[in-house]
Amino acid sequence: MQPQDLDLNYGLLEDILKAFLQNEIRKFGFSSVVLGLSGGIDSAVVAELAVRALGPEHVLALKMPYKESSRESLEHADLMIRRLNIKAEERPVTPMADDFFRDVPEGERLRRGNIMARTRMVLLYDVSARDGSLVAGTSNKTELLLGYGTMFGDMASAVNPLGDLYKTQVRGLARHLGIPSILIDKAPSADLWEGQSDESDLGFSYGEVDLLLYMMLELRMEREAILGEGVSASFYDRVRKMVVRNQYKRLMPVIAKISGRTPGIDFRYARDWQEVR
């Protein structure tokens, strides 16, 4: 397996994702979106797609830095705001996050990171309610499969155009869309603390894990066949465990089924019956 095996027809993909945003937002009865613009590639791609699908007047970018956030990240977010000519607001999370952090030891970075992600989502959904817009998500397929995200934090959204794209494919789409290379080529980071990077947290690169996930999920290859492709047993076992262990993050809260028509189980598609008016 080679990285190019994950390549897609990115022109067709762009059309599909623009139609997805237009149709889903219309079905919900809305016309605009708000998203957190971090300065990273995922949020840049979602912002670009939203503008092409809805128009710049229907897209609001929220910058939500913490006091230790990378200055480079803010500059890259501003670069996309200027490129797309979209409205933007800066809402620092420092005061709210620091209130929580008083009770969280500095060494407990996972807890602090989850608090930061959920604080940002509180701001996004408050702006969504204020403006009557929908929150557009930016989590990609790799993150969702590995559980590399915060429930009701960065994983929360109303619509997510990237959820079925591996990180490698997001990069390919970004190049097709003309996203500045400085955003595409930099080390991915959730900007949760100074010097944080996704790949150092995970212990492997997106390129490596995307190929493994593709063989596991899309090709449905057995363990021995994947090991025959040169994947180490320890890497395979670790990634499989992450995918299985984090299944709960990919589901809405599990409901105890009592009746014959249970929300999310038997009764799922009400909003598709007709347009909301």
UniProtKB/Swiss-Prot annotation:
Top-tier EC class: ligase
- State whether keyword Glycosyltransferase applies: no
User: Where, if anywhere, are coiled coils annotated?
Assistant: none
Biochemical pathway: Cofactor biosynthesis; NAD(+) biosynthesis; NAD(+) from deamido-NAD(+) (ammonia route): step 1/1
InterPro entries per record: NAD/GMP_synthase (IPR022310), NAD_synthase (IPR003694), NH(3)-dep_NAD(+)_synth (IPR022926), Rossmann-like_a/b/a_fold (IPR014729)
**SUPFAM superfamilies in the record:** Adenine nucleotide alpha hydrolases-like (SSF52402)
* Chain sites annotated for binding Mg(2+): D42, E143
Please give the Gene Ontology molecular function terms for this protein: ATP binding; glutaminase activity; metal ion binding; NAD+ synthase (glutamine-hydrolyzing) activity; NAD+ synthase activity
Q: Kindly state which keywords UniProt assigns to this record, in alphabetical order.
A: ATP-binding, Ligase, Magnesium, Metal-binding, NAD, Nucleotide-binding
Chain positions recorded as ATP binding sites: G36, L37, S38, G39, G40, I41, D42, S43, T138, K167, S189
Q: Write out the catalysed reaction.
A: deamido-NAD(+) + NH4(+) + ATP = AMP + diphosphate + NAD(+) + H(+)
**Looking at the keywords, is Magnesium present?**
yes
Binding-site residues, deamido-NAD(+): R118
EC number from the UniProt entry: 6.3.1.5
Q: Which domain of life is it from?
A: Bacteria
Which cellular component terms (GO) are annotated to the entry? cytoplasm
| Gene Ontology terms: biological process | NAD biosynthetic process
Record HAMAP family: NadE_ammonia_dep (MF_00193)
Q: Which family does it belong to?
A: Belongs to the NAD synthetase family.
Q: What does this protein do?
A: Catalyzes the ATP-dependent amidation of deamido-NAD to form NAD. Uses ammonia as a nitrogen source.
Its subunit composition reads: Homodimer.
Q: What name is this protein filed under? A: NH(3)-dependent NAD(+) synthetase
Species per Swiss-Prot/TrEMBL record:
Chlorobium luteolum (strain DSM 273 / BCRC 81028 / 2530)
Chain's gene name: nadE
